[in-house]
Amino acid sequence: MSRHKSKSIPGRNLRLADQIQKDLAGIIQREIDMTRAGLITLSGVELSADYAHAKVYFTVLGAEPDTAAALLNEKAGWLHSQLYKLLHIHTVPTLRFVHDPQITRGIEMSMLIDRANRPGPHSGVPDEPEDQS
């Protein structure tokens, strides 16, 4: 009995994930009224090995992440059908939208660093010493 070699194309997973992210961002921007969900940015797509499932990571400004996730997941079936029209692949993955906490945490860390570097009585950085000439 012979073994079948993997027919996986190197880098295909990453290229497909990038294409899905790009296409979804365009569809969401053009076709869906997301006023209740705030400003949504897709930050990444993670595909399963068989391309059947995709976790779509997003960040949101101006709304609660849970609200945005609920609206996006409510539209996931319709978004899947729109992707099917754009992507020329046999299996378009089912979509699940997940808030990306990494971006939010990065913003919080940046704000803490800015606050720590700001001179003043509550910043932790001493004021410039007065010139005693």
UniProtKB/Swiss-Prot annotation:
Write out the function statement from the record: One of several proteins that assist in the late maturation steps of the functional core of the 30S ribosomal subunit. Associates with free 30S ribosomal subunits (but not with 30S subunits that are part of 70S ribosomes or polysomes). Required for efficient processing of 16S rRNA. May interact with the 5'-terminal helix region of 16S rRNA.
Recorded protein name is Ribosome-binding factor A
Q: Which NCBIfam families match?
A: rbfA (TIGR00082)
Molecular-function annotations in GO? ribosomal small subunit binding
Known partners and oligomeric status? Monomer. Binds 30S ribosomal subunits, but not 50S ribosomal subunits or 70S ribosomes.
Cellular localisation: Cytoplasm
Q: Which GO terms describe its biological process?
A: maturation of SSU-rRNA
Q: Which UniProt keywords apply?
A: Cytoplasm, Ribosome biogenesis
InterPro entries assigned: KH_dom-like_a/b (IPR015946), RbfA (IPR000238), RbfA_dom_sf (IPR023799)
Q: Which Gene3D superfamilies match?
A: 3.30.300.20
Family from the record: Belongs to the RbfA family.
Q: Name one Pfam family in it.
A: RBFA
**Can you quote a single GO CC term?**
cytosol
The highest taxon in the source lineage is Bacteria
Q: List the disulfide bonds.
A: none
